[in-house]
From Swiss-Prot:
Species assigned in the record: Entamoeba dispar (strain ATCC PRA-260 / SAW760)
Name of protein: RNA-splicing ligase RtcB homolog 2
Keyword Cytoplasm among UniProt keywords: no
Family under the similarity heading: Belongs to the RtcB family.
Remaining remarks: Ligation probably proceeds through 3 nucleotidyl transfer steps, with 2',3'-cyclic phosphate termini being hydrolyzed to 3'-P termini in a step that precedes 3'-P activation with GMP. In the first nucleotidyl transfer step, RTCB reacts with GTP to form a covalent RTCB-histidine-GMP intermediate with release of PPi; in the second step, the GMP moiety is transferred to the RNA 3'-P; in the third step, the 5'-OH from the opposite RNA strand attacks the activated 3'-P to form a 3',5'-phosphodiester bond and release GMP.
One Pfam assignment: RtcB
Cofactor remark from the record: Binds 2 manganese ions per subunit.
Chain sites annotated for binding Mn(2+) 2: C144, H281, H372
Length: 524
C-alpha cells in the first residue's frame, strides 16, 4: 500500500493523513480500485484471490450474504493505518500467507480480532515441516465453547418460577470480570483437571458419566501437558473453576421456539415447541488467557517474526516450542471443559432447589458441548488425498458430517451438533454438520452472531439503561453483574444471527435444526 506500513502489525497509533484512493463500485459497495482485481463475489461468499496480499499461498474465502458482504466492504473501505487490528478481509488474506496453509476461511459471523479474525478457520498441512501453529489463530480464551442441556420442563412449568430461578442462578454461579468461586484448587487438583478435563468431575460425582459421550473430544484432550502451564496462569485459574466470566459469556434458560428438522431434533431429545433448555457459554477464564499470552510473548520475541502481521507470528507445529504451545493449549482446553461441567453441576443443583425434583427426574441431560477457540490435529481429504492437518478454529465451531467416527453414535445419522448463540436477548440455534462442510470448511461452521461494532463504540452509541428496559419489554429476566456494561452486549452491537446461520445453510456447510428463545439471561 502507498503508506508503506505492514498491514495488521500492532504498533503505536500515530496521526496519519487520510489517503485518497480511487474508488469503484463493487456489487453495490465502494472499494478502492486497486482491490477490485483480487475480489470475487459468489452468491454465498467473497473470494479473496491470491495476490491481494503479497505472499498468499492460495485464495481465501469469506462466507456472507448481501448484508454481511456490505459490512465487510465498508470495513475494508474505512480501515486505517495504525489501527490495532486490520479489517476482517485483510486478516483473512493475511492468514493465507502462513507456512503450510491449505486455505484461509472466514465464517459469516467473522469480525476483526488479534491475528486471525474471530470467525476464522485455517488448516495447515502437517506433511510440510514448516507448517505453523499460531496462538493468534486460537485466541486468548482457549476452548471458549458452548453447551446445551435439555429438560422435560415446558415454558408453562417455568413461568411461575422465572424470577426465583433467575435469582438463584445468579447467586449460585459466579459471573463477572475476575470473578472467583468459593473453592481454591490445590496444585494436584489443577494438574488433574488440566490433564483429565471433564473426566475429573465425573470421578468426583460432579458430572454424569454420560456427559463425556456428548462432549467434543469426550471432554478430554489427551495430548496435554499441565506442566507447561506457567505458575502465573495456574494462579489465575486456581479459584475460577465453575465461574462464568464476563463479556459475551452467558448462561441462558431458553425455550424451543421453532423446529426445522424434527428428525434431527428428536435425536437430540428435543421433541416439541416450548421445551426448556439451558445454554452455557464460557471458556478457560484467566488460565487460558495467560497461556495464550505466555506463548504470544514467546513467539513475538523470537527472531523469525511474521512479516505480514506480527500478530500472526507462530512457530512450526513440529518444533519444540510448537509442541509446547499445543500441549499447554490442550491443558487449558481441558480446564475449560471442566469449567463448563462445573457450571452445569450448579445449574442442575439450582433446578433441583427450585423445582423440588432431582436433575435425573427433570431429564437434565447434556445435548452437546462444543469448542470454538481451538487448534486440532485432524485428517481431511485434500485433492483426493487424506492429509493430516492442524486446523485452527477461532470463533468457529467444528461441525462434522453424518457418520464421522468421532461424533457420538446417537448423532452419527444426523451429523455433529453445532450450538450457535445469538446476541443478548435474541434467539440461538442448533445446527448440524454436512458433507459439503467437510469439503468446503474442514468441517467448520459459525459460532455466534459476531460483533458489528466494537465494545467501545457500543458503550458510546447505545444506552445500557435502554438495553435493560428492552429486555424487560421482551419478558426476559436479565441478571447482569454490572448493568452499566449492558450496552457492550446489546443486540445492535451484533450481526443478525438469523442471517449468519441461514448463510451457513445456503452455503451448505451446516443445516439448521431448531431455534431457541431466551427466558432468563445471566451475564457478568
Amino acid at each position: 500500500m502507498s503508506s508503506g506500513y505492514k498491514p495488521g502489525k500492532k504498533r503505536k497509533v500515530q496521526p496519519v493523513q487520510p489517503i485518497k484512493k480511487e474508488l469503484v463500485d463493487f456489487y453495490g459497495c465502494q472499494i478502492p480500485k486497486e482491490y477490485e482485481p483480487y475480489l470475487q463475489r459468489t452468491n454465498v461468499s467473497l473470494i479473496i484471490k491470491k495476490g491481494f496480499i503479497n505472499g498468499m499461498k492460495n485464495d481465501a474465502e469469506m462466507f456472507c450474504n448481501d448484508d454481511l458482504f456490505e459490512l465487510l466492504m465498508n470495513e475494508l473501505l474505512n480501515e486505517q493505518p495504525g489501527a490495532s487490528f486490520s479489517s476482517c478481509v485483510r486478516q483473512t488474506a493475511n492468514v493465507a500467507t502462513l507456512p503450510g496453509v491449505i486455505k484461509s476461511l472466514a465464517m459469516p459471523d467473522a469480525h476483526s480480532g488479534y491475528g486471525f479474525s474471530i470467525g476464522g478457520v485455517a488448516a495447515m498441512r502437517l506433511d510440510d515441516p514448516n507448517a505453523v501453529i499460531c496462538p493468534g489463530g486460537v485466541g486468548f480464551d482457549i476452548n471458549c465453547g458452548v453447551r446445551l442441556l435439555r429438560t422435560n420442563l415446558d415454558d408453562k412449568d417455568i413461568e411461575p418460577h422465572l424470577v426465583e430461578l433467575a435469582d438463584a442462578l445468579q447467586k449460585n454461579i459466579p459471573s463477572g470480570v475476575g470473578t472467583t468461586s468459593n473453592q481454591t484448587l490445590t496444585e494436584k487438583e489443577m494438574n488433574e483437571i488440566m490433564n483429565e478435563g471433564l473426566e475429573w468431575l465425573v470421578k468426583k460425582d460432579l458430572a454424569w458419566k454420560e456427559d463425556l459421550v456428548y462432549c467434543e473430544e469426550n471432554g478430554r484432550i489427551i495430548n496435554s501437558d499441565p506442566h507447561l502451564v506457567s505458575q502465573k496462569a495456574r494462579g489465575r485459574g486456581r479459584n475460577q473453576l465453575g465461574t462464568l466470566g464476563s463479556g459475551n459469556h452467558y448462561l441462558e434458560i431458553q425455550r424451543v421456539d421453532e423446529i426445522m428438522d424434527m428428525e434431527a431434533a428428536k435425536q437430540m431429545g428435543i421433541s416439541h415447541i416450548g421445551q426448556i433448555c439451558i445454554m452455557i457459554h464460557c471458556g478457560s477464564r484467566g488460565l487460558g488467557h495467560q497461556v495464550c499470552q505466555d506463548f504470544v510473548d514467546l513467539c513475538v520475541n523470537q527472531s523469525n517474526k511474521n512479516e505480514v502481521d506480527i500478530q500472526l507470528t507462530g512457530v512450526p507445529f513440529q518444533s519444540d516450542n510448537g509442541q509446547k504451545y499445543f500441549k499447554a493449549m490442550n491443558a487449558a482446553a481441558n480446564y475449560a471443559f471442566a469449567n463448563r461441567g462445573m457450571i452445569s453441576y450448579h445449574v442442575r443443583c439450582t433446578f433441583e432447589q427450585v423445582f423440588k425434583k432431582s436433575p435425573k427426574d427433570l431429564d437434565m441431560h447434556l445435548v452437546y458441548d462444543v469448542c470454538h477457540n481451538i487448534a486440532k490435529e485432524e485428517i481431511h481429504l485434500i485433492d483426493g488425498n487424506e492429509i493430516k492437518c492442524i486446523v485452527h478454529r477461532k470463533g468457529a465451531t467444528r461441525a462434522f458430517a453424518p457418520l464421522n467416527p468421532v461424533i457420538p453414535d446417537a448423532y452419527k445419522p444426523i451429523g455433529q451438533p453445532a450450538i450457535i448463540g445469538g446476541s443478548m436477548g435474541t434467539c440461538s440455534y442448533m445446527l448440524v454438520g454436512t458433507q459439503e462442510g467437510m469439503k468446503k470448511t474442514f468441517g467448520s461452521t459459525c459460532h455466534g452472531a459476531g460483533r458489528k461494532i466494537s465494545r467501545v463504540k457500543a458503550m458510546k452509541d447505545i444506552s445500557s439503561n435502554s438495553v435493560v428496559e428492552e429486555m424487560k419489554k421482551k419478558g426476559i429476566e436479565l441478571r447482569i453483574t454490572d448493568p452499566k456494561l449492558a450496552a457492550e452486549e446489546a443486540d445492535g452491537a451484533y450481526k443478525d444471527v438469523k442471517e449468519v446461520v441461514e448463510t451457513c445453510q445456503s452455503a451448505g456447510i451446516s443445516k439448521i435444526v431448531f431455534k431457541l428463545k431466551p427466558l432468563i439471561v445471566v451475564k457478568g
